[in-house]
UniProtKB/Swiss-Prot annotation:
One of its GO terms (biological process) is protein refolding. GO terms for molecular function: ATP binding; ATP hydrolysis activity; ATP-dependent protein folding chaperone; heat shock protein binding; protein folding chaperone; unfolded protein binding. One of its GO terms (cellular component) is cytosol. This is Chaperone protein HscA homolog. The gene is hscA.
């Protein structure tokens, strides 16, 4: 059975053409870049030997600073220093204000309601800010590797939605990077440990970073990772450990209130104590004129409630995944906070096995991304990692007006299943034709037809009342199954096709080029088709209503006014001006409002006929 085409269009896999590629962990608190050199994946360091780049950007009046120099400006220049921009990616300003009401930035909304940070250098959106972090990482990689990057793999949380993933890719494009793939962070961690070539089964990835906690339950089947469930807490991380220790120290010192400088000094001391206690049983402290110590046991008592919260999230994720803790084969630890021995002990006890900790937990995600990038760049043509199988072109369905509704976007890793609900267009419709297409264009005529089948036995209902759930499922062998199910009766039909059969790399490349070349033209054609479909719906509905109730509820003049509105809309519908059709629909709706109200009153009277007030 032929697999889906898994090579990127135009990619060369010739062994002598070694390409420079990198894996990027674009993190909430810190970011890293890694690459495979001499067959080994490792993180790339800056001029001072540091692999970590703080995910902080300062837009000062004099310069843009990224990383450590930017972090130093956080206290003195908070309005122009953006920390944890990853939290803002792909979100509306309204959403951000609800989730993070205490951010120090000066926000304003774009025309589409997206957040814009007002800085000394002008307006900056989250994509631009993320791009500056990516540029800094790319410059480090270029300097270290001695050449331009052919492509990168960027990791994202497994729970990132489409908007957040698109925003991440846009940021990379703005940074001048070619994205080979977006890779789920837990999958990257599993790849770093070589679990993709190990025993099949369930893997847990416990990710406790500086500001967030994520738990992911994965299933490895035939070399392909499937995300079964995710969970966590976007406001719980190692920073919270530091604050608990700082509060404890404040109580020990006997201070009731603190200046900002004292608070920062306590936090720094707390962070250092936490680090020391990963190796020693006691940490000595000298802060704000106070000398004392903190034991590992005291630390464990302080952080136990937070750790319990993470384990509750693990329990929920296992329940969502439908698996028991003892079914988990391996537990991968990610994030600097998992260095704490108590964290490792508690997680090990919960899952009943020793977690994997041999790879630096700060670096494990970037290393996994680097391994994936090396393969995608064509440097390992014989690699057997089936995780590379992707949908080469989007899979969609034809809707009214010859439009394409994409169900599974291109570059989605397989296996995958996606479902969407559709409804009937006409009153009394008892069958629906399902047309499966492949391609990136907006209109069916410009895409490749894969299959057609019919769903029959839909109960006669008013247009829009039926609920038909269409599911697209692509298995690890690239076999597409399409199922259509009418929800009220359970009637269903299905078909199986091989979506990539008969397409060469050149044909795929050409289809992608066409989608870009005709993008504007396609969107205009789609807008016109959508307005025509809506006009048809309005015309058909109004004609049907006039036939049913026009004689009873309208006088001749009112009837003629509506008929003229319908004729005008039909004339506009047959034209090529989408805006004119849209206005015609609005005018027709306005002209028919009184008629619609009378029909509603009639329906209510009919429903109440023969019933007393007490019955109602």
């Amino acid at each position: 059975m032929a697999l889906l085409q898994i090579a990127e269009p135009g990619q060369s896999s010739a062994p002598h053409q070694h390409k420079l590629a990198a894996g990027i962990d674009l993190g909430t608190t810190n970011s890293l870049v890694a690459s495979v050199r001499s067959g080994t994946a490792s993180t790339l360091v800056d001029s001072q030997g540091r692999s970590i780049l703080p995910s902080v950007v300062n837009y000062g009046a004099d310069a843009t600073r990224v990383g450590y120099p930017a972090r130093e400006q956080a206290e003195t220049d908070p309005h122009n220093t953006v920390i944890s921009v990853k939290r803002l990616l792909g979100r509306s300003l309204q959403d951000i204000n609800q989730r993070y009401p205490h951010l120090p930035y000066r926000f304003k909304a774009s025309e589409k309601g997206l957040p814009i940070v007002q800085t000394a250098q002008g307006d900056k959106n989250p994509i631009q800010i993320s791009a500056d972090i990516l540029k800094a990482l790319a410059e480090r990689a270029t300097a270290t590797l001695g050449g331009e990057l052919a492509g990168v793999v960027i990791t994202v949380p497994a729970y990132f939605d489409d908007a957040q993933r698109v925003a991440t890719k846009d940021a990379a494009a703005l940074a001048g990077l070619h994205v080979l793939r977006l890779l789920n962070e837990p999958t990257a961690a599993a790849i770093a440990y070589g679990l993709d070539s190990g025993q099949e089964g369930v893997i847990a990835v416990y990710d406790l970073g500086g500001g967030t906690f994520d738990i992911s339950i994965l299933r490895l089947s035939r070399g392909v990772f499937e995300v079964l469930a995710t969970g966590g807490d976007s406001a719980l991380g190692g920073d919270d450990f530091d604050h608990l220790i700082a509060d404890h120290l404040q109580a020990q010192i006997g201070l009731t209130s603190l200046t900002a400088e004292q608070q920062r000094a306590l936090i720094n001391a707390a962070t250092q104590a936490k680090i020391d206690l990963t190796e020693y049983m006691t940490a000595e402290l000298n802060v704000l004129g106070w000398q004392g110590s903190l034991t590992r046991e005291e630390l464990e008592n302080l952080i136990a409630p937070l750790l319990k919260k993470t384990l509750l999230s693990c329990r929920r994720a296992l329940k969502d995944a439908g698996v028991e803790a003892d079914e988990v084969l391996e537990v991968v630890m990610v994030g600097g906070s998992t260095r704490t021995p108590f964290v490792r002990e508690q997680v090990g006890e919960f899952f009943g096995r020793t977690p994997l900790t041999s790879i630096n937990p700060d670096e494990v995600v970037a290393i996994g991304a680097a391994i994936q990038a090396d393969i995608l760049a064509g440097n390992k043509p014989d690699a057997e990692m089936l995780l590379l199988d992707v949908i080469p072109l989007s899979l969609g369905i034809e809707t009214m007006g010859g439009l394409v509704e994409k169900i599974i976007p291109r570059n989605t890793t397989i296996p995958v299943a996606r479902a969407q609900e559709f409804t009937t267009f006409k009153d009394g419709q008892t069958a629906m034709s399902v047309h499966v297409v492949q391609g990136e264009r907006e209109m069916v005529d410009d895409c490749r037809s894969l299959a057609r089948f019919s769903l029959k036995g839909i109960p006669p209902m008013a247009a829009g009342a039926a609920h038909i759930r269409v599911t697209y499922q692509v298995d690890a062998d690239g076999l597409l199954s399409v199922t259509a199910l009418e929800k009220s009766t359970g009637v269903q039909a299905e078909i199986q096709v091989k979506p990539s059969y008969g397409l060469s790399d050149d044909e795929v490349t050409q289809m992608l080029k066409d989608s870009m070349a005709y993008a504007k033209e396609d969107m205009l054609a789609r807008a016109l088709a959508e307005q025509r479909v809506e006009a048809d719906r309005v015309i058909e509905g109004l004609v049907s209503a006039l036939q049913a109730d026009g004689d009873e509820l309208l006088n001749e003049q009112e009837r003629q006014t509506l008929l003229q509105a319908i004729e005008r809309l039909i004339e506009l519908r047959n034209g090529d001006n989408a805006d004119a059709i849209e206005q015609g629909i609005k005018d027709t709706d306005k002209a028919s409002q009184d008629f619609a109200s009378r029909r509603m009153d009639k329906s209510i009277r009919s429903a109440l006929a023969g019933h007393s007030v007490d019955e109602i």
